[in-house]
Every structure is written in structure tokens, then in C-alpha cells.
Amino acid sequence: MKSSTVTIEVSAPARYTYLDLTEELERAIKDSGVTDGAAIAFCPHTTCALLINEWEEGALEDFRNRVRHLVPEDVYYAHDDLDRRTQNLAESHERQNGHSHVKSMLLSASSHAIPISAGEAVLGRWQRLILFEMDEPKGRQVVFHVFGG
């Protein structure tokens, strides 16, 4: 069995923007030499999400608007209350991003397993692997672990 792990660095230009990572996934599969197996796409961050869906501006706008409506930025988040919070504090400043963490938890989309057949990702006709940034733009890692025969 072959196995390969590739980590890429990406950065969305702004909060609530998307990056299409499908080509990076396909490159990781091709470079692995795996023809039949699976690829796991994993994002080790708590304020962005990996989605598999259609890359269509209207659908992406609708999703962004629904997420922002479900979890508004302008309400109290205990995560942002530094008089109360005692865990996982950075040594530098703490961002007011409780809303981003709640959105990420609701989506529960830090990883996806994608089948591989004939050396290609098995995705539906319109499906793309998409990173959705819900916090400030910054460098993000996405890990592709490809395995199989």
C-alpha cells in the first residue's frame, strides 16, 4: 500500500471568503502514485472549514449569508470575555472571534475522506473541495493524506 502526506499553505483574502482547493487535492493524489484508495483532506484550524460543494457564486453567497445570520458577530461570546476566559490564551493579543469558533463547530467540517479511483478524486460533477474562512485572513494549513494501491 502506498501512502503520502502533503501539507499546503493557503490564505483567504478576507473573512467569509472561499478558496477552491480541488486542484491541490488532485495534485496530491497524482504525486502520490495512488490509483485506487482514498484521500483525506484535513484543516487543523478552529475558525475555518473544508466544504465539498458546488463552486457557484450564488450558492456560495447564500451559504455565507445563512452562516452569518445563524451566528451573528455582534452578540456576547464567552470566548471573547477575557475577564472570564482562562484557557488557551495566546501570549499576544486575543482576537474577538468567538463567532468564528461557533460557526466552525456548527459546520463540523475540518476533514473529508474522498475516494480515489483510476488515479482521480471521485467527486460529483459539480463538487469542489473548498476552504471557507470565517476569521481574519491568515495563513492556513491543509493536510492531504493519500493512501491505497
Descriptions of predicted regions:
Residues 1-149:
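Active-site histidine-anchored catalytic micro-motif
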